[in-house]
A protein has these predicted regions:
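Extended catalytic cores of very large enzyme megasubunits
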Residues: 1-560
Length: 560
């Protein structure tokens, strides 16, 4: 047995032990589970034995002065992995203190501790039809990770199979009410999420404005004031321990009385940065003086209603409403406010806009509450106090030599990844009880893709072309349709998500909206016609299977 085999066995045992805790609350095994087909792997051959491995030294230096800020020698990667890929995995995802026996040093260790945990939890919760299917699942998942076909989001690599809490979700949506206890709890919850390697967003619109009175008779501070404290807290906490900075999103409704202050907040801070930079202060990203500037640790977004956008189009007035009683306390020119928003976004890229009515029209769970906010990157939108674990497919891996798109492998990859992502919710830990309860009840997933631009370039298609848009639309539709089809299949095996029954009508309505949107895709070239044909079939099956089984997941896909 080689050194790598010994390490693999030890790490698999550790990962299996971590996964065994998932057996609490375990569902009864169904009569029939998933059958998993081999696509990439060969029976009797481990994926690791099909590639050549090499040892490398990873030494990272400070670009300013050349000093070494990270060093780990003798790490092991496949010979086809780029230097950049190996550096990222070594510095970000290997666990254990550098220089100790606990430190991971091989990609095999990393993949094994994650994949073995997923397999164990899948078997415990009745996902697979047989032990053979579980073994194929493990090998296929290993092969795809080894060959960079896809990747889970960072918290999976940070936490799964370690002694740390098994936080698997990168994206969280919190809530905050108009009380000091709730505001202070917001700070605490964000800190716990950042510590686990993730990011969080929330809507501050319940907090009364600075133009309203407190019950004691004094004037309220307003949400922008409380943003300052949360921003400072995020700036001191590195996500995942020491691997990356915290990520935040703050949202404010367009009818909040403090909306103008919110819109201009970051633009004013950018003005300060320019002045301080010109005066000789170190204002680079990560510079020693940048911490003196506020609101640099969050993305800001304005939640715009259809009513507001119509007022902008018509040049009308728009009412800002008190948080305490809903009364209009100020009227503004809608077009002027929108212009300020656009100007601020032009100056500093913030705030963004979230279209509230459109978002909620595509909401699969309206009976459980409105969507009021998003995660930091704005691709995940769902109920308050929920989370979403992500995975991203590498589209270039599905481009054939003749420039066709390998739809068969793409569909199989999506099915396997969605299955793995759903399994992770069975063993995942969550930073708060409320988030854990809601996520387990709705099981939101976020499969997506990367390298669309590279795929279009390799295919000879311009971004701004009908052919490029058609291929992108067809691939996205196929991915999402396949994801929801697999979700419906899983519902038939391990049951629909807990919140499905009360939202069944709405969920099925949104699936039909997706089906109609797919029908609106206009294909241009043979490659996107082939992809779109499969997407159309997938959505037909989604509607049919969803009617029969329901769905395992309230959401399935995102695009960051």
């Amino acid at each position: 047995m080689t050194e790598a085999d010994v390490t693999r066995s030890a790490d698999s045992a550790r990962a299996d032990a971590a996964a065994r805790k998932a057996s609490s609350g375990k569902q009864a095994h169904p009569a029939k589970g998933l059958r998993v087909d081999r696509v990439y792997t060969t029976a009797g051959v481990h994926p690791y034995d099909e590639v050549s491995w090499e040892r490398r030294d990873v030494v990272m230096t400070n670009w300013r002065d050349g000093s070494i800020n990270f060093e780990q020698r003798g790490v092991e990667f496949p010979d086809f992995w780029s230097v950049n890929a190996a550096n990222i995995v070594t510095t970000k995802y290997f666990r254990g203190a550098v220089g100790t026996d606990a430190r991971e040093w091989s990609l095999r260790q990393l993949i094994d501790r994650v994949v073995s945990t997923y397999r164990a939890a899948g078997e415990q919760h009745g996902y697979f039809g047989s032990a053979e299917d579980a073994g194929v699942f493990e090998h296929e998942l290993t092969w795809m990770l080894l060959h960079q076909v896809f990747s889970f989001n960072s918290p999976v690599w940070f936490n799964v199979g370690t002694t740390s809490p098994q936080q698997v979700s990168a994206c969280f949506i919190l809530s905050v009410d108009d009380t000091m206890d709730s505001i202070l709890n917001w700070y605490r919850e964000e800190g716990l999420i950042f510590k686990g390697g993730s990011g969080a967003g929330l809507n501050l619109s319940r907090i009364r404005s600075s133009k309203e009175l407190l019950t004691s008779g004094g004037t309220a501070s307003g949400p922008v004031s409380f943003m300052r404290g949360a921003d400072a807290s995020a700036g001191t906490i590195k996500s995942g321990g020491a691997t990356r900075r915290a990520a935040k999103m703050v949202v404010l409704d367009v009818d909040h009385p403090d909306i103008e202050e919110f819109i201009e907040t970051k633009a004013r801070e950018e003005d300060k940065i320019r002045v301080l930079r010109d005066a000789g202060f170190d204002m680079d990203l990560g510079g020693k003086d940048i911490t003196s500037v506020q609101y640099q640790n969050a993305n800001n977004s304005v939640r715009a209603s259809d009513e507001f956008m119509r007022a902008v189009e018509e040049g009308g007035q728009f009412g800002l409403r008190a948080r305490t009683n809903g009364a209009v306390i100020e009227t503004v020119d809608a077009k002027s406010l929108f212009r300020k928003l656009a100007q601020a976004a032009w100056e500093c890229a913030d705030p963004g806009i979230q279209y509230d009515d459109t978002i909620n029209d595509w909401h699969t769970n309206p009976e459980s509450g409105r969507i009021t906010a998003s995660n930091p990157c704005s691709e995940y939108m769902s109920l308050d106090n929920t989370s979403c674990n992500l995975a991203s497919l590498n589209l270039l891996k599905f481009l054939n030599d003749d420039n066709s798109f390998d739809t068969e492998k793409f569909v199989k990859a999506v099915e396997l990844i969605i299955t793995a992502m759903d399994i992770s919710i069975c063993f995942a830990d969550f930073p708060t009880e409320a988030i854990g309860e809601t996520t387990r009840a709705y099981r939101q997933l976020g499969i997506g893709y990367a390298n669309l631009g590279a795929l279009l370039m390799a295919s000879g298609l311009a971004y701004d072309s009908d052919g490029g848009r058609a291929l992108a639309g067809a691939i996205t539709s196929l991915m999402t349709g396949t994801s929801y089809r697999r979700s419906a299949e899983l519902a038939g095996i391990v049951g629909p998500y807990e919140g499905y029954a009360r939202n069944a009508t709405a969920h099925k309505r949104v699936m039909r909206k997706h089906q109609a949107a797919n029908d609106a895709v206009r294909t241009v070239n043979p490659v996107d016609r082939d992809v779109h044909e499969l997407a159309t079939a997938a959505w037909d099956q989604v509607v049919r299977l969803g009617e029969k089984n329901g769905f395992r997941n309230a959401q399935a896909s995102v695009l960051a």
